[in-house]
């Protein structure tokens, strides 16, 4: 076992002395050392209850012959970080999570890991660490929040963001909004729709890295604690079998993940996180393959924000396992991939079934024939851009409009709130990419405000930044190359015509080649490129992040240092 490096032999007496200072017995020292990564924080509703989950995990480890060691890592709440400079740090925190786990696992020679995330960037950060370290590892999250109830309807955090738009449009008053905000988030857990956190927790099941139920058992259910205890027990089985993350997450596994992504209508952020996870396992990722999977994978679930149906309803309908079983029976996923259950995906799914066909529809009656996400290519995005087509009224939507260009989110948000944006406009928010932001901020404020104003089908929003899983409407993100790298989005001016064809997967700037080349020359001649950032954001971690981060088309993963 790895931990023998720090506890066996005469030369390790000092190490054993320090371990005994922790109160460990010789019996405990003789057992495998299992790291339990607790991302508890009092700042994040999705993580506020993780101490209890962690205790259940440790009980399961002890029950099956291991010695657990709890340590912590950071967690950022994207909702609280939204709409101000804090959002620069959200995506960038993913790499800190992965690095912190690497440091602790390597520094203390741990034998296996149980990873306990909940929210947006913590889930992929932990999966990236698992792939990088490649020691036995398993994930159990904190689970989704239950929805609130307001005016007789289920509500989630996205309802509040869209409520802000209703107030700005004069449709509602502040007293109404104040009442809504008090009822939208009634429990602990990750926000209650198919937003980024729940998308990634569901996909963790699809990737085989968590036990069934991880993505959907509500945070407040005792069933979540049972799952945590079983997860702690199961990590010891993984250790004994020497079953590692790279044995589980393969090219076929990732393709399964994309299929489930399409069937569930997950967040566009998954298209950043899946390639970053693949990168850590040295697995090739082709963004264009997403459309191949989407074309043949119907969307069979439609959860908030695409509908009012909360994530908890998916659990009652049969959970991710029921969705996987549908896809397996239709030949849309590979059932031979391994899982942390110690059996193949097909074996794990043999008893899975759909309980509610209104929530998980049959393949013969999907919500749409294509999957929930679409990658767009064209002269504005030769490396790709992404839209959540499952949240549109039609997956063959065509939109042509005039650009309103903003260098950064703040002036765009002000223009929307000041009612300067009209039907037929294409709001372009640039210099918000991984490098240009830096940190690729989410644009939930602008998209939710437009939705609240009733403009989400009449105004497009185009950015080299990204969107919250709670965003809907004509929201196109991850435009690559980004403006800071000289992508054509940097050349746009107010009034330029932009055409979006969802059915054909195209994003085009309608411009002559002569005009485009003239714009390119003007851009190249600019002594100082547009930069809306405060100088302090280039210092510290964000400065280092901006230096190493790659394109969104590569998952905004950091460049590896060359020897």
Swiss-Prot record:
Q: Which Pfam families match?
A: ILV_EDD_C (PF24877), ILVD_EDD_N (PF00920)
- Please share the entry's free-text remark on the cofactor: Binds 1 [2Fe-2S] cluster per subunit. This cluster acts as a Lewis acid cofactor.
> Which top EC class is named for this enzyme in its record?
lyase
Q: Which GO terms describe its molecular function?
A: 2 iron, 2 sulfur cluster binding; dihydroxy-acid dehydratase activity; magnesium ion binding
Which cofactor(s) does the record list? [2Fe-2S] cluster; Mg(2+)
Pathway entry: Amino-acid biosynthesis; L-isoleucine biosynthesis; L-isoleucine from 2-oxobutanoate: step 3/4; Amino-acid biosynthesis; L-valine biosynthesis; L-valine from pyruvate: step 3/4
Positions where N6-carboxylysine occurs in the chain: 121
Give the UniProt keywords, A-Z: 2Fe-2S, Amino-acid biosynthesis, Branched-chain amino acid biosynthesis, Iron, Iron-sulfur, Lyase, Magnesium, Metal-binding
What is the role of this chain?
A: Functions in the biosynthesis of branched-chain amino acids. Catalyzes the dehydration of (2R,3R)-2,3-dihydroxy-3-methylpentanoate (2,3-dihydroxy-3-methylvalerate) into 2-oxo-3-methylpentanoate (2-oxo-3-methylvalerate) and of (2R)-2,3-dihydroxy-3-methylbutanoate (2,3-dihydroxyisovalerate) into 2-oxo-3-methylbutanoate (2-oxoisovalerate), the penultimate precursor to L-isoleucine and L-valine, respectively.
Q: State the name under which the record lists this protein.
A: Dihydroxy-acid dehydratase
């Amino acid at each position: 076992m790895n931990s023998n490096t720090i506890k066996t032999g005469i030369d390790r007496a000092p190490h054993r002395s320090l371990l005994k200072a922790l109160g460990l017995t010789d019996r405990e020292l003789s057992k495998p050392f299992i790291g339990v990564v607790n991302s508890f924080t009092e700042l994040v509703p999705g993580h506020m209850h993780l101490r209890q989950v962690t205790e259940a995990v440790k009980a399961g480890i002890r029950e099956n012959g291991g010695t657990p060691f709890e340590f912590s890592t950071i967690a950022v709440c994207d909702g609280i970080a939204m709409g101000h400079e804090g959002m620069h740090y959200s995506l960038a925190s993913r790499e800190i999570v992965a690095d912190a786990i690497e440091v602790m696992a390597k520094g203390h020679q741990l034998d296996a890991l149980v990873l306990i995330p909940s929210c947006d960037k913590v889930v992929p950060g932990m999966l990236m660490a698992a792939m990088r370290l490649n020691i036995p590892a398993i994930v159990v999250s904190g689970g989704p929040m239950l929805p609130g109830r307001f005016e007789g309807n289920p509500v989630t955090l996205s309802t509040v963001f869209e409520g802000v738009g209703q107030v700005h449009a004069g449709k509602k008053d502040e007293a109404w909004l104040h009442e809504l905000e008090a009822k939208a988030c009634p429990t602990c857990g990750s926000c209650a729709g198919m937003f980024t956190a729940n998308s990634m927790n569901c996909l963790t099941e699809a990737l085989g890295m968590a036990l069934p139920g991880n993505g959907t058992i509500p945070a407040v259910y005792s069933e979540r604690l049972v799952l945590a205890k079983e997860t702690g027990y199961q990590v010891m089985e993984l250790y004994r079998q020497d079953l590692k993350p790279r044995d589980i997450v393969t090219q076929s596994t990732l393709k399964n993940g994309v299929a489930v992504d399409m069937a569930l209508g997950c967040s566009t952020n998954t298209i950043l996180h899946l390639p970053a996870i693949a990168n850590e396992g040295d697995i090739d990722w082709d963004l264009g393959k997403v459309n191949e999977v989407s074309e043949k994978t119907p969307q069979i679930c439609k959860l908030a924000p695409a509908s009012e149906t909360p994530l908890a309803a998916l659990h009652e309908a049969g959970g991710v396992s029921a969705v996987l079983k549908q896809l397996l029976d239709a030949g849309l996923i590979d059932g031979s991939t391994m899982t942390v259950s110690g059996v193949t995906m097909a074996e794990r799914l043999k008893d899975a079934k759909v309980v509610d066909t209104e929530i998980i529809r049959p393949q013969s009656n999907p919500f749409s024939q294509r999957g929930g996400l679409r990658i767009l290519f064209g002269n504005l995005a030769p490396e790709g851009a992404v839209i959540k087509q499952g949240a549109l009224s039609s997956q063959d939507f065509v939109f042509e409009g005039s650009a309103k260009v903003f260098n950064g989110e703040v002036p765009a948000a002000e223009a929307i709130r000041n009612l300067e944006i009209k039907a037929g406009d294409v709001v372009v928010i640039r210099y918000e990419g991984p490098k240009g932001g830096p940190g690729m901020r989410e644009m939930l404020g602008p998209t939710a405000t437009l939705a609240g104003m009733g403009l989400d089908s009449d105004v497009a929003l185009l950015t080299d930044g990204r969107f919250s899983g709670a965003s809907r409407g004509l929201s196109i993100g991850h435009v690559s190359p980004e403006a800071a790298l000289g992508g054509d989005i940097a050349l746009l001016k107010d009034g330029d015509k932009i055409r979006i064809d969802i059915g054909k997967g195209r994003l085009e700037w309608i411009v002559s080649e002569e005009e485009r080349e003239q714009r390119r020359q003007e851009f190249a001649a600019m002594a100082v490129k547009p930069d809306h950032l405060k100088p302090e954001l280039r210092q510290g971690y964000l400065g280092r992040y901006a230096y190493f981060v790659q394109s969104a088309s590569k998952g905004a993963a950091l460049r590896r240092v060359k020897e």
